[in-house]
Amino acid sequence: MIQHPRIGIRPTIDGRRQGVRESLEVQTMNMAKSVADLISSTLKYPDGEPVECVISPSTIGRVPEAAASHELFKKSNVCATITVTPCWCYGSETMDMSPDIPHAIWGFNGTERPGAVYLAAVLASHAQKGIPAFGIYGRDVQEANDTDIPEDVKEKLLRYARAALATGLMRDTAYLSMGSVSMGIGGSIVNPDFFQEYLGMRNESVDMTEFTRRMDRGIYDPEEFERAMVWVKEHIKEGVDRNREDLILSKEEKEKQWEFVIKMFMIGRDLMVGNPRLAELGFEEEAVGHHALVAGFQGQRQWTDHFPNGDFMETFLNTQFDWNGIRKPFVFATENDSLNGVSMLFNYLLTNTPQIFADVRTYWSPEAVERVTGYTLEGRAAAGFLHLINSGSCTLDGTGQATRDGKPVMKPFWELDESEVQAMLENTDFPPANREYFRGGGFSTRFLTKGDMPVTMVRLNLLKGVGPVLQIAEGYTLELPEDVHHTLDNRTDPGWPTTWFAPRLTGKGAFKSVYDVMNNWGANHGAITYGHIGADLITLASMLRIPVNMHNVPEEDIFRPKNWSLFGTEDLESADYRACQLLGPLHK
């Protein structure tokens, strides 16, 4: 059984015996316990289990104790460390020198003992040795006997822990390509060096004929298939067929296509994570799967010109339920766009919520909207907006039909209930695919995302000579008047899922206007997640040594390793590029 990655907590202490160390033992160890309690009581793994922490076997005052802690952490699948102390300690003697995992240090802000002095000293050692570390120092002085963690310290500890866990969850997993390059899209030219060196992941690949092989040879669970057919007939609404009359399939042909796309979903899932039921059926090799944390399906054009498209498969893999009930989502990229798949993966591991995959399709200016519809935009839409629409698939959680405190949300599967599942299904239909584009047919996913949800749009790009760079745009979904929505939506493909998105503008750089956001977006796709998580993404990117070339996160929320400031404090974007370039990928 694979262990969850854990956070290692290291209580460091002044090594002087005969009074000094002894007086600090309880306070120091209590700091470690309080950090572990905070993390375990607040954060969860993608499967819903509380995040686990491992505390060093003793306080760390000298090198042998640092070594003992290191040995314990190696055996315990620790993916990141947090060092805590209320006092002076011996910097380079007590630090963790593992170069391939993230590190953070919380130095207690008190007057009785110089915790801040140790923090500064050990961070200097980290910078000198080229091992980045995040510095955490509370804004306000605390009393020596104060066991509470200040709110500003909590925020940084949790931001660090979320991002660090994401690095651990990715490590030693795989990206599975189902097919190859789709329509010349750069993101589907999968770069194994990027996955290996930046994420610690491997790449696997299967030809799309693996789907037909498994269908023809019955390499799927026939009982599940029968159950799925019943569920689909009961719960899935087939949408309006907008095809030309000569391209409309018969009822019998559509019935066969439903059978086909259900099998595609089952096979796509089994390829990613395996299925013990296949071993019972005599298919031991296929039962293992590919240990894929994220995958992508090429589809266009070779598959979709001949077979039903992957929209149903992609939709339900990215959704948090199917005929087997509510479950955690998979991360699955349309058109095998591995870079958007990784963008979705970053979002997912930071939030435990499903992801919207979308084309960044159109910028609608206020003037263009008024010309086309006669409507004057107002509120969050006043400066214009982006039309996010994928070519036929999207997580049903993207409908926004789940709620929290009466507001639309996308939330982890363990918070989802059956009434929300039904609401998603009721607000979605599945029209036959546009056969001018998808000659083999299939069924698209059609819905409208509810407005007023805080969301973050993300994209990872590869730049020759630099490597990966990340783009982040926080903003809100919009709910347009119904007639305005229909007028605009009908100008594209009304059989596809639509999200209207207004990025938050800052008045400068790429966020001077909504047009500038569109104009500076690095690719045709984006990954959209619930919540404003730009600050968490910036922290994660710094751990992986991926510079951020565009974001609208307030400067006070940016949290990177302390040695980033040694690359410059005025132009943070340039400092980020220099730090990432000098340090190189996390796993190289």
UniProtKB/Swiss-Prot annotation:
Q: What class of enzyme is it?
A: isomerase
Residues forming the catalytic site:
E335, D359
| Pfam families xref list | Fucose_iso_C, Fucose_iso_N1, Fucose_iso_N2
Q: In which pathway does it act?
A: Carbohydrate degradation; L-fucose degradation; L-lactaldehyde and glycerone phosphate from L-fucose: step 1/3
Per UniProt, Mn(2+) binds at E335, D359, H525
Coiled-coil region: none
Q: What is its EC number?
A: 5.3.1.25
Q: Which reaction does it catalyse?
A: L-fucose = L-fuculose
Q: Which cofactor does it need?
A: Mn(2+)
**BP GO annotations:** D-arabinose catabolic process; L-fucose catabolic process
Sorted keywords for this record are: Carbohydrate metabolism, Cytoplasm, Fucose metabolism, Isomerase, Manganese, Metal-binding
Q: Does the keyword Mitochondrion apply?
A: no
The places in or outside the cell where this protein is found are: Cytoplasm
SUPFAM superfamilies, from UniProt? FucI/AraA C-terminal domain-like, FucI/AraA N-terminal and middle domains
Regarding protein family, the annotation reads: Belongs to the L-fucose isomerase family.
Query: PANTHER family given for it?
Result: L-FUCOSE ISOMERASE (PTHR37840:SF1)
Job description of the protein: Converts the aldose L-fucose into the corresponding ketose L-fuculose.
Q: What is this protein called?
A: L-fucose isomerase
Q: Which organism is it from?
A: Streptococcus pneumoniae (strain CGSP14)
